[in-house]
Structure formats: structure tokens, C-alpha cells
A protein has these predicted regions:
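Substrate-binding cleft of carbohydrate-active enzyme catalytic domains
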Residues: 152-157
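N-terminal hydrophobic targeting/anchoring segments and the immediately downstream early-domain regions
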Residues: 1-147, 151
């Protein structure tokens, strides 16, 4: 049987919806991931560039942590590069606006990222999504990398 590694899943954002369930009627449900023989799943913490984006990522982290309590779900560590039985999950920040809102000091992004890393294994941090933010331009913009984006990249390095 083939093994599938999936690098993007919106389950934690979906779980922000009222009455949602990790095994609900959604194509990214844990049940469907198991049925598709997904052995490693990146759980993208997405928030739009707007007020409340940092709190939204913190809520998604809570859902991520609760997924780890489900039978057969474990946190994946790429440095071990070893898949176990079940579903390995690892978090990612899909839009750095989830680390720091537009009107907050950029140092808040560093503090929030450090805190996230203390709570979950993070696969990657995306600076933008579709639109422009303080870190750079998304795929629907002409803006490039901005000074705060350079600072975040330096911090990640």
C-alpha cells in the first residue's frame, strides 16, 4: 500500500468553526486522512491579515494539541525522519500575520514564534498568503519582501 505525505491541511482552521469536529463531514477530517493512508500531515495554522490574527493561531494551536490526543495520532519530528504507525502531524504557520498583527511591534512576532515552537513542532513559517502584509507581498500582489520580512527571516535563521 502506498504511503502519502501531505504538506498542507486546513483542519485546524476548519476546527475554529462552531460545531466542527476533527472527524466531521469535511475532506480534511482525521478519518479521511487515515483512509487515504496519510502517514505525515502538515497542519497549517492560517489566519488572515486582520485584527485577531494572533489569537486565531493560538486557537488553532489548541486544536492541534487536541488532535494529538486522538488514537493513532502523534507529533511528527522530521529530524528523526521516521514514520510510525498512525498519522504523524506537524504544525506550520501559513501567514506570519498570525505571529504579529500589523500594528504590533515586529518583536512580538519573534516572541510568539518562540512560544509556538515551545508548544508544537513547526515545519515552516510562510511570510504571506495571497495578499500583502507587513512581511511582504503575497501571490496576488506585486510587493516583494519587506523590512519586517527580512527581520523575521534573520530570526528564523
Amino acid at each position: 500500500m502506498e504511503v502519502n505525505l501531505d504538506l498542507h491541511c486546513d483542519l485546524t482552521a476548519y476546527l475554529l468553526q462552531p460545531y466542527s469536529s476533527p472527524n466531521g463531514d469535511v475532506r480534511c477530517s482525521v478519518d479521511k486522512l487515515f483512509a487515504g493512508n496519510v502517514k505525515m500531515q502538515v497542519m497549517a495554522f492560517y489566519s488572515a491579515t486582520e485584527k485577531g490574527s494572533v489569537d486565531e493561531v493560538k486557537e488553532q494551536l489548541k486544536h492541534y494539541r487536541s488532535l494529538l490526543n486522538l488514537p493513532g495520532v502523534y507529533e511528527f519530528y522530521p529530524e528523526k525522519a521516521e514514520l510510525q504507525e498512525g498519522l504523524g502531524i506537524i504544525a506550520a504557520v501559513e501567514n506570519a500575520s498570525g505571529l504579529c498583527e500589523e500594528d504590533q511591534p515586529v518583536e512580538d512576532a519573534f516572541k510568539n514564534l518562540d512560544w509556538l515552537i515551545s508548544q508544537a513542532k513547526i515545519m515552516y513559517v510562510g511570510l504571506t498568503h495571497h495578499l500583502e502584509n507587513r512581511f511582504g507581498g503575497g501571490n496576488f500582489t506585486q510587493a516583494g519582501l519587506k523590512d519586517d520580512g527580512k527581520r523575521l527571516i534573520d530570526f528564523l535563521d
